[in-house]
């Protein structure tokens, strides 16, 4: 067995496992939005608009998530992938 065969034999995910992983991500995202307050979608959009005043970004570069703990504590998590500055 050559060294090239070792690297070629790495397992590629089959379509079923890839589809399962994607479905799990979608379900987790929908569950997170289910407990969100009514104002959350509008607030999310307004936050994105404010960021766009300063940086050119697309919707897929922004992730906004609201996590609610059992202790009546809500955490708003905002992840923005900023473009490289030149």
From Swiss-Prot:
Keyword Cell cycle included in the entry's annotation: yes
Record-linked Pfam families: MinE
Transmembrane regions listed in the UniProt entry: none
Keyword Ion transport: no
UniProt xrefs under Gene3D superfamilies: Cell division topological specificity factor MinE
UniProt cross-references to InterPro entries, sorted A to Z: MinE (IPR005527), MinE_sf (IPR036707)
Keywords of this entry: Cell cycle, Cell division
Recorded superkingdom: Bacteria
Gene Ontology process terms (BP): cell division; regulation of division septum assembly
Function: Prevents the cell division inhibition by proteins MinC and MinD at internal division sites while permitting inhibition at polar sites. This ensures cell division at the proper site by restricting the formation of a division septum at the midpoint of the long axis of the cell.
Family per similarity comment: Belongs to the MinE family.
Protein name: Cell division topological specificity factor
């Amino acid at each position: 067995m050559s060294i090239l065969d070792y690297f070629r034999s790495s397992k590629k995910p089959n379509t079923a496992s890839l589809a399962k992983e994607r479905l799990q991500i979608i379900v987790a995202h929908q569950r997170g939005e289910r407990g969100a307050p009514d104002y959350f979608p509008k607030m999310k959009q307004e936050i994105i608009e404010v960021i766009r005043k300063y940086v050119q970004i697309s919707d897929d570069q922004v992730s906004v998530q609201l996590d609610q703990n059992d202790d009546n504590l809500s955490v708003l998590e905002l992840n923005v992938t900023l473009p490289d500055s030149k």
